[in-house]
């Protein structure tokens, strides 16, 4: 069995390869974006499979291209790749990489399946660098329209929970005045709203996910599992968290528009939820409690309450 240290070391090795590729080939990745225009797993086993498949190849490069697919076209893109691309060069590149690694759209009955989502979660720092590198040259596949705010997209991608440190695996999950509290709160809301919009109605009924309360509870359970993963050391989580929020920081503090965005999230999203959902959120994190308590006020009042509560260390 692969040890946790071996898993962490292998992730760091491949991360270094991929980040190096990003720094040296950003233009190529952005071009590739244009050319393709139109959760519980065994990390050790998946890494072993990838390492074997990557023999004789530049896996850093391949990983970058796979993650570009993930964040510009979505996880379903790997199905019938050639039919979904308007530029031949992009079709050839994408098809060759997807086929070589055997990337599939969903796990299905294969516990060891390689999916774009699993790759994104396994190498979260690479994912973050991909999103930051191609965001100016592509429309990224993220829908935040139901949050009632804007400007927080980089914090809402599926790799971010890998950077979160929980204070407890039982509610409240985050009660410190730090960045993890903010990120967990954002992802609980984004995850529930995304599930509400994208999950077929028939499946929602079958799984009893027909109310905001049900969706939040479902999302929280999955999010806690994801945040509890030990693929990254706590030090790495902290380092990557700080890198993630750099665009929102100025002179050791968060910028004014960051607090404004959180205030709008409170008044534009939480205010619309029913009382049972609001009460559930109040017990998940201290930031969500503040947002619920101030959702009936103005954007500025909600933003001030959140800013006054939080500190700006980690």
UniProtKB/Swiss-Prot annotation:
Modified residues (N-acetylmethionine): 1
Coiled-coil region(s): none
Subcellular compartments: Virion; Host cytoplasm
Residues in the signal sequence: none
Positions annotated to bind RNA: 38, 41, 118, 237, 266
One term of GO molecular function: RNA binding
Alphabetical UniProt keywords: Acetylation, Capsid protein, Helical capsid protein, Host cytoplasm, RNA-binding, Viral nucleoprotein, Virion
Annotated function: Encapsidates the genome, protecting it from nucleases. The encapsidated genomic RNA is termed the nucleocapsid (NC), and serves as template for viral transcription and replication.
Annotated domain remarks: The N-terminus is involved in homooligomerization.
Name of the protein: Nucleoprotein
Source organism per UniProt: Wheat yellow head virus
